[in-house]
Regions:
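Surface-exposed loop/interface segments of Gram-negative outer-membrane beta-barrel transport/assembly proteins
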Residues: 1, 36-43, 47, 51-138, ...
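Short glycine/proline-enriched loop/turn "hinge" motifs that connect secondary-structure elements
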Residues: 16-21, 171
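Short coil-to-beta-strand
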Residues: 21-25, 166
Length: 228
């Protein structure tokens, strides 16, 4: 079928984990590639995760949780536009020829002419392409210190990076293409966010009485860069 497909879903994962008396860890890798019901509709992502917690001494514990992901965010699928001026492969005649006499894709499969000639996604697809997606690094680092007299201190910081890319081009060699549609579109942006948390806790039991007090300090920042 030139328009629809039996979408294939692929999801692969591998992981390892382990623990000792003082350290436990986990690491995983994954890849996903999903196809939709329409030709050209697809999504893919690569992801990984690492977690580690360690008891360094009787009074110090540290940990880290790191997530990485690179995923697509756009595709160029067969056009099924609903307006009468939109390209739509379903409007082609059953007798339309998608190839010319030399076996190459025919731009106008119903008549070979621009006027009422139909639409061939596969001919046009030779002249444009798209790369669009996100790369994300999410991290959390923490430490806990046990202090005398029932006091403890905990520190958490969570930096997050996100990169976005959008690269599209249409060749001027595409016959009868609109001058406004030809050319290149390039977009890039980066986000950097972080938040941190400092917590001091006092937990003490006096006879039948249990006292708990907590002091918390938090801070965060969001930064954004773009060439658009």
């Amino acid at each position: 079928d030139m328009v629809f497909q039996n979408g294939l879903r692929q999801d692969y994962n591998a992981s390892i984990s382990g623990a000792t008396e003082r350290v436990n860890y986990y690491f995983s890798l994954g890849y996903i590639n999903n196809e939709g019901a329409v030709q050209g509709n697809e999504y893919n992502a690569f992801r990984s995760n690492m977690k580690i917690n360690a008891k360094i001494t009787d009074w110090l514990e540290v940990g880290a949780n790191v997530n990485f992901q690179d995923r697509s965010d756009g595709d160029i699928q067969v056009s099924l536009g609903s307006n009468y001026w939109d390209n739509n492969m379903l409007r082609n005649s059953p007798y339309a020829s998608m190839y010319d006499n030399n076996g190459n894709y025919e731009q106008y499969p119903m008549s070979g002419l621009p006027t009422n000639g139909g639409y061939n996604y596969y001919f046009d697809r030779q002249y444009y392409d798209l790369e669009k997606g996100y790369t994300v690094l999410n991290t959390i680092f923490n430490a806990k210190i046990t202090l005398p007299a029932g006091f403890s201190y905990q520190f958490n910081i969570a930096p997050r990076y996100q990169w976005f890319y959008d690269r599209y081009w249409m060749s001027a060699d595409l016959p009868n293409a609109s001058a406004a549609d030809r050319g290149v579109n390039r977009g890039w942006s980066k986000n950097f966010d972080w938040n941190l948390n400092n917590t001091i806790t006092w937990d003490k039991i006096f006879g039948e009485h249990h006292f708990t007090a907590t002091l918390v300090q938090e801070a965060e920042e969001h930064r954004y860069w773009s060439d658009n």
